[in-house]
From Swiss-Prot:
<dbReference type="GO" id="GO:1905268">
    <property type="term" value="P:negative regulation of chromatin organization"/>
</dbReference>
<dbReference type="GO" id="GO:0016480">
    <property type="term" value="P:negative regulation of transcription by RNA polymerase III"/>
</dbReference>
<dbReference type="GO" id="GO:0000122">
    <property type="term" value="P:negative regulation of transcription by RNA polymerase II"/>
</dbReference>
<comment type="similarity">
    <text>Belongs to the WD repeat HIR1 family.</text>
</comment>
<dbReference type="InterPro" id="IPR031120">
    <property type="entry name" value="HIR1-like"/>
</dbReference>
<feature type="compositionally biased region" description="Basic and acidic residues">
    <location>
        <begin position="370"/>
        <end position="384"/>
    </location>
</feature>
<keyword id="KW-0156">Chromatin regulator</keyword>
<dbReference type="GO" id="GO:0031491">
    <property type="term" value="F:nucleosome binding"/>
</dbReference>
<feature type="repeat" description="WD 7">
    <location>
        <begin position="519"/>
        <end position="557"/>
    </location>
</feature>
<feature type="repeat" description="WD 3">
    <location>
        <begin position="110"/>
        <end position="149"/>
    </location>
</feature>
<dbReference type="GO" id="GO:0003677">
    <property type="term" value="F:DNA binding"/>
</dbReference>
<feature type="repeat" description="WD 5">
    <location>
        <begin position="255"/>
        <end position="299"/>
    </location>
</feature>
<keyword id="KW-0805">Transcription regulation</keyword>
<dbReference type="GO" id="GO:0003714">
    <property type="term" value="F:transcription corepressor activity"/>
</dbReference>
<keyword id="KW-0677">Repeat</keyword>
<protein>
    <recommendedName>
        <fullName>Protein HIR2</fullName>
    </recommendedName>
</protein>
<keyword id="KW-0804">Transcription</keyword>
């Protein structure tokens, strides 16, 4: 290895960043850009070329005003430089044009916004992270149009680009690390929130991924109280593959070589490995690591009296360039025998092909392109155990990491299982049996020491129902579904008076955002919601605040006494479910309860899951909300959906996953085609056309178009749960086997009618009158075609009302009109004409219809 310090000080002693474009090393500082031939620099370091013969191939100057060039990135077709407030770009001809190169101003920031990093993926996209706005902008080279925006939860510090062109990693100022998936059209979504945390000093990092795209380095990761660099394996869910300990204190640079290396072994296959360079230490050292070893391959200690601003590898992987803060360039020239055999591009491409690719993102909608905003969406579950990691202090004592999380998605704390140690439990009486039975023990309560048993809330520790509660997020936003420009933003403080939590309602506008109101509380806020004329939020302790759109308190703070698991608003109603399963539904406008306090405990199948042990696990609650009329709705992970009837004060079953197996009319929305008639293969048309009726088909299409139908939505959620559990195949087997068994020939008809009857009753309870009338006609047509004469007569008799059919209404429609429509729809079905004829004669329709 040869080391050369370029003798001339560059850019008046201010070199801030560099990048390698083709065979040129591009460095920037002040208002100047210089490009040097990497081959000549390495030849000069080896003594093959006189140093005085090495000079800049290209010298450029940019009109920066009071700004200074701090970032540079580029590819074969572009060169991008940026300062704190401006971004400039040049085309592919900048090398030949020289001083005649024209720089286009891509963006100019104002106010408190500032550029924190610029990266190019080499395939037509440039990423710019902007603080103040807390965003990452995606630009398409050539036209330099902004094609996408990533909205972040905190100030972005560093960007890491995936060489495979799929992932963008963002290091945030709050020490968290987020990974996003992107495509060339600018569509972006959250891929994973990493459990690792980084130090915030130094703030700016220079990080690259491995050339094969499977390793992501994180510098200054906290582990056992010591700074370390962790290499995360992309193919294993970004778990830690190896750790570099030592020589990384206050490190801010970790750059992989663009080539892959191989070391031959005598008795074993050759070992393939990456090389990466780290620097940024206060002593100005440059360290080269072999990813297969725990010790550095090269430790060039104190090559400069100041610190290193940037490190770049040559394209051939044999040269390393370091830029010092005092404006000097250091060239490291290696021989192949020192680093190992260089693998060719074909072998590197083979390794890239072995990395699993992600499912392609859908193209961004025109609406999102107009707003130039791509909101991150989480498609993988964050590691729930990451918040429980313990950190060892210097004293050797373990301290628990804070539960405050930075993810914009909601995570939950598990229910508490702790009780005081002085609590004694009655021993179980063991029954003597001849045989030995093995029973899987349930999770028992965990005793722990308390300073005072009064600190423990008995009603939580011994509650029959315990729900998970949301974790505290550092900041999050909640948008009104009806008015997307109304956004409530919560920025949690420290949970004390020194730094209270800020609650802000903002009206987003294209020209200017307007703050409608702001409030402060010395507590952590976990959930937000809104109705037609109110906004509500709850704290970690279970205190609910209700505001008007102008910030006026509509109700005094309501004390739940325990943490809140669900808080949902709709219309004038606010629904609250505590961690003990207590259900509250308030009419905010009138300031009173819709119905007495109830519980969701009956929905968790307590009789089925009852045991002598203390704790049993129930189905997860996937949704808990309310309608505009104040009717609570709940769905479970098994696919069942429920509603609470305020009049009867009991829970009612809306949709049973069993109906998906046999009902012909399951899932009118056809979201997943889960009905048995839709899963029966080649016999689908025969089964569906068995009782085909044009009037019924038309009515079904009308119901299908109703996007506001509660039952349609709940049935689609049932299908989602069944798809998630892989039960869709069972539907196909059901349609082919059980319907052919003896004694089950009419099972499909019975399940279909049961499903329709329940939908009718639920629609009537939910006051969905239009859907009720259509379903009633479909139900009567089905009864007529299946030959259920007595049941059809029962329905017609209910409508006839002992001859008082001209008095009163059903679902806002006159009984007489509804009865006439049903009789006309069933008039052509011969097997029920005796039933329909008698009612048609009573209504005076017989002569007209005949």
């Amino acid at each position: 290895m040869k080391l050369l310090k370029y003798p001339r000080q560059l850019h008046d002693g201010q070199l801030l960043a560099g990048c390698v474009v083709g065979g040129l090393l591009v460095v920037v500082g002040r208002d100047r850009i210089s490009a040097y031939d990497c081959g000549k620099l390495q030849a000069a370091a080896r003594g093959e070329l006189a140093v005085r013969e090495v000079s800049a191939e290209v010298e450029l100057q940019v009109e920066v005003g009071e700004d200074a060039l701090r970032y540079v990135a580029g590819g074969e077709g572009e060169l991008v430089v940026a300062g704190d407030r401006q971004i400039w770009a040049a085309g592919a001809d900048w090398r030949s044009a020289g001083r005649g190169t024209r720089f286009l101003t891509v963006a100019q920031l104002a106010g408190g916004a500032c550029v924190t990093d610029v990266k190019a993926d080499g395939a037509g996209l440039v990423f710019v992270s902007v603080s103040g706005k807390d965003e990452v902008w995606l630009y398409a080279t050539g036209a330099w149009e902004r094609v996408g925006v990533v909205t972040l939860a905190a100030k972005p510090v560093t960007l890491v680009v995936d060489p495979l062109g799929e992932l963008l990693t963002v290091v945030l100022q709050n020490r968290s690390v987020a990974v996003y998936q992107y495509n060339r059209q600018g569509a972006v979504r959250m891929h994973q929130q990493l459990p690792q945390y980084v130090q915030t000093n130094p703030l700016r990092y220079s990080i690259t991924m491995s050339p094969q795209g499977d390793l992501l380095p994180l510098v200054n990761s906290i582990k056992n109280g010591l700074p370390s660099a962790q290499l995360l394996d992309r193919t294993a869910g970004f778990s830690v593959q190896s750790t570099l300990v030592g020589y990384v204190d206050k490190c801010k640079i970790l750059r992989f070589s663009p080539r892959l290396y191989e070391k031959p072994n005598k008795d074993k296959p050759p070992t393939q490995y990456n090389l990466l360079a780290s620097s940024g230490n206060e002593d100005g050292s440059v360290i080269v690591w072999n990813t297969k070893r725990t010790k550095p391959l090269l430790n060039a200690a104190k090559v400069t009296d100041t610190f290193i601003n940037d490190v770049q590898w040559s394209r051939d992987g044999t040269g390393l360039f370091a830029i010092s803060n005092d404006g000097y360039l250091f060239i490291f020239a290696f021989h192949e025998v020192e680093l190992g055999r260089l693998l060719d591009d074909a072998e590197l491409e083979k390794l890239r092909q072995s990395v699993p690719r992600l499912e392609p993102l859908p193209p961004p909608t025109p609406k999102s392109l107009a707003k130039s905003e791509a909101k991150p969406q989480q498609d993988t579950k964050p590691d729930a155990k990451s918040s429980a990691n313990s950190v060892s202090a210097k004293t050797g004592k373990k301290k628990i990491a804070p539960t405050v999380i930075t993810s914009t998605s909601m995570e939950f704390n598990e229910p508490s299982y702790t009780v005081p140690k002085d609590l004694k439990r009655r021993p179980k009486q063991e029954t003597q049996t001849n045989g030995t039975t093995t029973k899987r023990p349930k999770r028992d309560v965990e005793p722990m020491d308390f300073l005072d048993t009064n600190l423990l809330i008995p009603n939580i520790s011994f509650s029959k129902a315990r729900l998970a509660t949301p974790k505290v997020r550092m900041n999050f936003q909640y948008c009104n579904t009806l008015q997307q420009n109304l956004v409530m933003e919560v920025k949690n403080g420290t949970g004390s008076e020194q730094k209270p939590t800020s609650i802000t309602l903002t009206l987003k506008d294209k020209e200017k955002d307007m703050v409608l109101f702001q409030d402060f509380t010395p507590r952590f806020v976990t959930i937000c919601t809104c109705g037609h004329s109110f906004w509500a939020c709850c704290t970690e302790e279970g205190i609910v605040y209700v505001y008007s759109n102008t910030g006026k308190k509509l109700l005094p703070p309501m004390i739940m006494g325990v943490p809140v698991s669900f808080l949902e608003g709709c219309g004038d109603y606010l629904l609250c479910v505590t961690s003990m399963g207590q259900l509250f539904c308030w009419n905010v406008k009138e300031g009173k309860l819709k119905f007495p306090v109830n519980t969701i405990y009956p929905l968790l199948n307590p009789s089925i899951r009852y045991s002598d042990d203390v704790l049993t696990r129930a189905e997860n609650i996937t949704m808990c909300t309310t309608t505009e009329n104040g009717i609570p709705l709940v769905t479970l992970s098994n696919g069942d959906g429920y509603m609470f009837d305020p009049d009867m004060e009991i829970w009612l079953l809306i949709n049973d996953s069993w109906w998906a197996y046999g009902s012909q009319y399951w899932d009118f929305t056809n979201t997943s085609h889960a009905g048995s008639s839709a899963a029966a293969g080649n016999d689908k048309e025969d089964k569906k056309n068995k009782y085909w009726n044009a009037d019924a088909e038309y009515l079904i299409e009308e119901v299908k178009k109703n996007k506001k139908s509660v039952v349609n939505y709940l049935e689609s959620k049932t299908n989602d749960e069944m798809t998630r559990k892989g039960l869709i195949r069972n539907l196909q087997r059901f349609a082919k086997t059980i319907l052919m068994k003896e004694g089950f020939e009419n099972l499909e008809d019975i399940v279909t009618l049961s499903h329709l009857e329940n939908r009718l009753l639920v629609a009537l309870k939910l006051n969905e009158t239009n859907e009720f009338t259509k379903l009633l006609k479909v139900y009567c047509i089905s009864l007529a075609e299946m030959g259920f004469k007595n049941r059809l007569d029962d329905v017609l008799s209910w409508l006839y009302n002992d001859g008082e059919y001209k008095v009163g209404t059903i679902a806002n429609e006159k009984r007489e009109e509804l009865l006439k429509q049903i009789l006309v729809a069933c008039a052509d079905i011969r097997q029920v004409q005796r039933v329909t004829t008698s009612y048609a004669s009573a209504l005076g329709l017989l002569d007209v219809s005949l």
